[in-house]
């Protein structure tokens, strides 16, 4: 009986501390509940599995939203950081958490919405819709997925905002192209930013990475065909100009490297889909562009360079001067609004039966939204693959990206390595690549000059 009396709670007797604590908990729960009920539905679309493909027109003319948690942004990160290195990235994140640069605990206060399009990545708070930041696509150098125990992190390596100063390093930079010496002799290393997001699980992380990979693919393809359009159209209309641009007094010559950098500035990114649990590269991975590039670099990828060089060489040997001019006009019209069907029909008439295989070489330069129609047209006219002797080099291009769980991919969809991935680049490789392409296009212009001289 006495025990029952002891168990009876006397009304009103609650410690002040407990009362405040309970009130705060109830208030937070009520506030969180109100927020969750008031939140709008995300602007999203159905994706085709297993690659989470989305209609390219949506990314070009609309956008798609995904829910994430925003942990923060790290600035003044050395540009040579390998974003697919689990160890390096987690070490930075751990240090940032200790110094309170990044959130230590995941709460509903960090809920955010990431909006993806072919033009930028926008991040807003889930509640209130206030913009956190907006990153243009050409400022994104890489994206990677890293798992840390129960945390699923998606990390974007982006360009440092204007005004950011290079960081000092006592060691030589891992990449000579990214460092310079100050007057005092100290090494100045180019810097970048890391945007750190968290998602619910591995599937959500892979989906976000694959969507960004598609964005990269769209921009890469658009930029590549635009570059081809300008190169051929300019060469066809003014063949003596080639790729060398002279001033009016012909006293100075613009470096061809600058021309290519200006044209290729929008597709110099790498998309590391997953760093996963291991930093070792996939056995099936091929060498790709080094991970030591900053987002501000403007380099034409090796794959794009090879494709351009191959096609320009083929056109030079298979088409006459007049036909090259007609091709340039058709390509220019297609880039300015003509339908893919009209473009294919006109090219078919230009090439004829004996040279219809030339259409295969255009495959890498057809935007994703028109690729299916283009493939159907090739099959209709009896051109089904690119394994012939002439078109061997055209088969290197792959539209499908590797599985996000076992490899990294660069911006053009080719498989790439991770931490120890070997890749040859730097200035010599760049100069050689540009020289090869410029020689081909210059040869194209020279052949047109010779064809145009009356005998």
Swiss-Prot record:
Residues 272-299, 399-432 are annotated as: Disordered. Residues 292-385 are annotated as: Harmonin homology domain. Residues 60-247 form the PID domain. Gene3D superfamilies: 1.20.1160.20, Pleckstrin-homology domain (PH domain)/Phosphotyrosine-binding domain (PTB). Disruption phenotype: The heart chambers in mutant animals are huge, constituted of a monolayered myocardium lined by endocardium. One of its GO terms (cellular component) is cytoplasm. It is found in: Cytoplasm. It comes from the Eukaryota. Pfam families: CCM2_C. GO terms for biological process: anterior/posterior axis specification; cardiac jelly development; cell-cell junction assembly; heart contraction; heart development; vasculogenesis. Keywords: Cytoplasm, Developmental protein. Its main location: cytoplasm. Residues 278-295 have a biased composition (Low complexity). Part of a complex with MAP2K3, MAP3K3 and RAC1. Binds RAC1 directly and independently of its nucleotide-bound state. Interacts with HEG1 and KRIT1; KRIT1 greatly facilitates the interaction with HEG1. Belongs to the CCM2 family. PANTHER family: CEREBRAL CAVERNOUS MALFORMATIONS 2 PROTEIN, CEREBRAL CAVERNOUS MALFORMATIONS PROTEIN 2 HOMOLOG. This is Cerebral cavernous malformations protein 2 homolog. It comes from Danio rerio. The lineage of its organism: Eukaryota, Metazoa, Chordata, Craniata, Vertebrata. The gene is ccm2.
């Amino acid at each position: 009986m006495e025990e029952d009396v002891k168990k009876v709670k006397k009304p009103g007797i609650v410690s002040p501390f407990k009362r405040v604590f309970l009130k705060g908990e109830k208030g937070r729960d009520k506030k969180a509940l109100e927020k969750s009920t008031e939140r709008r539905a995300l602007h999203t679309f159905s994706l085709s599995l297993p690659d989470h493909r989305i209609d390219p027109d949506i990314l070009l003319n609309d956008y798609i939203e995904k829910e994430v948690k925003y942990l923060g942004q790290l600035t003044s990160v050395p540009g040579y950081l390998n974003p697919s290195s689990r160890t390096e990235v987690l070490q930075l994140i751990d240090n940032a958490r200790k110094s309170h640069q990044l959130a230590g605990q995941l709460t509903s206060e960090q809920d955010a919405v990431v909006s993806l399009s072919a033009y930028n990545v926008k991040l807003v708070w889930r509640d209130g819709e206030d913009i956190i930041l907006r990153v243009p696509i050409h400022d994104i150098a890489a994206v990677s997925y890293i798992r840390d125990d129960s945390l699923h992190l998606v990390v974007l390596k982006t360009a440092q905002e204007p005004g950011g100063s290079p960081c000092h390093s006592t060691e030589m930079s891992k990449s000579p192209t990214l460092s310079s010496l100050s007057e005092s002799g100290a090494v100045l290393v180019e810097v970048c930013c890391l945007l750190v997001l968290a998602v619910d699980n591995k599937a959500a992380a892979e989906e976000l990475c694959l969507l960004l990979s598609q964005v990269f693919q769209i921009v890469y393809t658009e930029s590549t065909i635009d570059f081809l359009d300008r190169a051929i159209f300019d060469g066809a209309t003014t063949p003596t100009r080639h790729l060398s641009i002279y001033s009016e007094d012909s006293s100075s010559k613009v470096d061809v490297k600058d021309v290519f950098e200006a044209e290729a500035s929008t597709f110099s990114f790498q998309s590391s889909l997953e760093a996963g649990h291991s930093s070792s590269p996939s056995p099936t991975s091929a060498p790709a562009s080094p991970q030591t590039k900053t987002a501000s670099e403007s380099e034409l990828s090796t794959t794009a360079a090879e494709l351009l060089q191959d096609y320009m060489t083929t056109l030079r040997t298979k088409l006459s001067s007049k036909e090259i001019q007609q091709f340039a006009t058709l390509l220019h019209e297609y880039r300015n609004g003509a339908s893919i069907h009209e473009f294919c029909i006109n090219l078919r008439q230009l090439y004829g039966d004996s040279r219809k295989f030339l259409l295969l070489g255009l495959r890498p330069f057809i935007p994703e939204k028109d690729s299916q129609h283009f493939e159907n047209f090739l099959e209709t006219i009896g051109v089904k693959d690119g394994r012939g002797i002439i078109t061997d080099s055209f088969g290197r291009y792959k539209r499908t990206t590797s599985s996000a769980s076992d490899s990294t991919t660069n911006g053009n969809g080719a498989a790439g390595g991770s931490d120890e991935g070997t890749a040859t680049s730097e200035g010599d490789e760049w100069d050689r690549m540009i020289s090869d392409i410029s020689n081909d296009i210059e040869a194209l212009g020279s052949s047109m000059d010779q064809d145009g001289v009356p005998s």
